Amino acid sequence: MLAAALASLMILTSGQDIASTQDPAVPQPAAVDLEDIIVEGRPLENLTQTFVREVAAPARNRGMARWRNGLCVGVANLQPEMAQYITDRVSTVAQDVGLKPGEPGCEPHVLIIATVDASAFTRQFVEVRPRIFRVGGSGMDRGGNAFEAFVENDQPVRWWNISVPVNDDTGLIAIRMPGYGAPSIGVQPSRITTQIVDDTKRAFIIVDVDKTKDVSLEQLADYIAFITLAQVDPEADTSGYATILNVFDDPAQTRTLTNWDRAYLQGLYTTVRRRQNTGAQRTEVVDSIVRAHHRLTSVEAPE
């Protein structure tokens, strides 16, 4: 299994052979959706701030990252038709936020691996290839404690994102990487704005097939799409919101990406990420999500 996954990292395939399979659902209280806010008059900005604060999990001391131009998805250890469905769904959601999906045979940035024992597999994977998870550059991941939680957690799906500070104008890496000299970057001095932003570079997603049996392939693919495109805190409490992130707690309640999810992704990918202060950056994302919400609801409103 591990050998196949490591081979996939280099030549990433769209799959091999294991069926998708999670523990019984736990009922959840009524969740807040965007339409509820309109009906009940609750403050959208406050709810959005809380959602972003709960969900967003950027690298240590960095802003919220996103993919720059496009991404290539590779899926290993699933039947070909299932692997292709997940690949296509993640690529479609990526395209919806303005990213270019990878061509067939592309070198993957996102590795999705299905396994019957995610904990054992992850420990072995990390032991064999530690450097692909902890690259060593400053501000590229959430740190040692988060990495240990990634290895040891018992969730149906676990993930690890790698991002890097870059010059927003050029896309060039703006930090010193292990084994390389310090980068030469020209920036405009300012106390308010910055040219240095964070780009997602890699995502590793490991699916435990024994713990995903109560969700459909469509639900699993949408869940994977969301955690691929955004840096999500695995411990986020989103029980009060209608979001695909709740799918393993209550599969019947969340069938697909919700308006919350779509607004979050659209807001993340349309915001201008130039604030020097990370708190101000997050406020920009919140404002962008609110604008995305207004666009979504205006399109869906009956005439």
Segments predicted by a language model, with ranges:
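A domain-level signal for the mature, folded cores of soluble proteins
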Residues: 18-21, 63, 67, 103
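Acidic/histidine-rich, surface-exposed loop or edge segments in extracytoplasmic proteins
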Residues: 32-35, 63-78
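Long, folded non-catalytic interaction modules
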Residues: 74-89, 94, 98-303
